[in-house]
Amino acid sequence: MKDLHNREIKSLRISITPQCNLNCFYCHKEGHNIDNNKLMTPTEIGEMVKYSLKYGINKIKISGGEPLLRNDLPEIIRNIKNLKNNQIKDISLTTNGILLEKYAQKLKDAGLDRVNVSLDTLDPELYKKITGGNVELVKRGIEKAVEAGLKPIKINFVVMSNTVGGLNDIMDYCRKMGVILQIIEFMPVDEKLKKYHYDINKIEEEISKKSDKTMVRKFMQNRKKYLVDGLEIEFVRPMDNTEFCSHCTRIRLTYDGLLKPCLLRDDNLVDVLTPLRNGEDINKCFIKCIDRRELYFKE
């Protein structure tokens, strides 16, 4: 199905919990304050995905909070994988990696295809300062994900004024591990954080000079990919980027069952969990969400 601006809807991003085991100072805390009565069950998540298939969804991204805090995550993945008439080509997970060592093989066995791991620095002290966590746990989790056969594995590196100095180390690490590096523009959630913003155009300019090959991901906001000495690098720009909006093919579902037409807005959400629990037809909820998508983000 296409929205009113002729963009096909291909991807559903599901936040399954707002809880997290880290405390990153820049986090936008996707989702809402937790209410266990509203938390979607594995069965309900499966039902949501089943309905979404009618509208062309063929990719599922599971996120949080930290999704690995839900012990029933393998069940959630199996429920999605085992849907009848399943056209899902890709089930992926975004995680901070702290618990990945424990769950990587279980997730692969349940049907997970690939994983994105957040890693802003390899420096133990800086990592602890940014997140409050232990970077060695993340590295062990990435190793287990590689061993389990989850692929491609992508490392989400958020560029900030205090992390950009470690870019070369991150590149070397990703090359050694055989994983993809995503260089992500930092989105300040308030005025106090603007000092951490770093212009990634400078980085891309340098990377492009070293690149052996350049590609464009047409259905992912026309993102450019570079191949540098065997390392694949992508740039992700959510800020002031018309391509990010005009090529957006994704809708989002919060942990408490609200459909989000836009990543950056919370004023046009559609409640889909209440109608589902009341035994109502939720097709109209998906249609309403898709119809509320605008061509560009407006504040």
Curated annotation (Swiss-Prot):
Names of required cofactors: [4Fe-4S] cluster
Broad class of enzyme this protein falls into: lyase
Source organism superkingdom: Archaea
GO molecular function (one): cyclic pyranopterin monophosphate synthase activity
SUPFAM superfamilies named among the record's database cross-references: Radical SAM enzymes
Pathway named in the protein's UniProt entry: Cofactor biosynthesis; molybdopterin biosynthesis
Alphabetized PROSITE patterns for the sequence: MOAA_NIFB_PQQE, RADICAL_SAM
Binding site for [4Fe-4S] cluster 2: 245, 248, 262
Chain positions recorded as GTP binding sites: 13, 61, 94, 154, 250-252
Catalytic activity as recorded in UniProt: GTP + AH2 + S-adenosyl-L-methionine = (8S)-3',8-cyclo-7,8-dihydroguanosine 5'-triphosphate + 5'-deoxyadenosine + L-methionine + A + H(+)
Amino-acid positions noted as binding S-adenosyl-L-methionine in the UniProt annotation, renumbered to this chain: 26, 65, 118
Catalytic activity, EC: 4.1.99.22
Binding site for [4Fe-4S] cluster 1: 20, 24, 27
Entry-linked InterPro entries: Aldolase_TIM (IPR013785), Elp3/MiaA/NifB-like_rSAM (IPR006638), MoaA_arc (IPR013485), MoaA_NifB_PqqE_Fe-S-bd_CS (IPR000385), MoaA_twitch (IPR010505), MoCo_biosynth_MoaA/MoaC (IPR050105), rSAM (IPR007197)
Family: Belongs to the radical SAM superfamily. MoaA family.
Role, per record: Catalyzes the cyclization of GTP to (8S)-3',8-cyclo-7,8-dihydroguanosine 5'-triphosphate.
Name recorded for this polypeptide: Probable GTP 3',8-cyclase
